[in-house]
Amino acid sequence: MHQTNQENRFRAWELLLDREEFRESTLRRLRTEEESPVLVLATCQRLEVYGHRLPDLEGVSIRHEWTEARAVERFARIAAGLESRILGELEVMGQVRQAYKDFHLVHGANWQELDRIFQQGVSLG
């Protein structure tokens, strides 16, 4: 029972790819994950994933992990452009909106809690 509660906690991960050639297959796998969907934010500067559980991935390591309120705060800060090299950078905000659209297109309203978190974050940008 305790493990299930752990898996249901909202999380954010900053990922590092062991090799750049893994990028496209990793992104495809993350974006189509059915069992525990995640929002994937891939920019030239970062690869971040938001959801409840990170699927098993080869050639990927976790650089940072945030849980619950800190994960929500992380997504909000990214969406608002506060973590960009240039404060409020519009390009990152557009990438966040596109990541949310991609998530919603694949997973729709089946994951209401995640959808609500992502909607609120996107509204900050």
Which positions does each model-derived feature cover?
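Short cationic amphipathic helices and targeting signals
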Residues: 15, 45-51
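Short glycine-/aliphatic-rich beta-strand segments at the starts of folded cytosolic domains
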Residues: 1-27
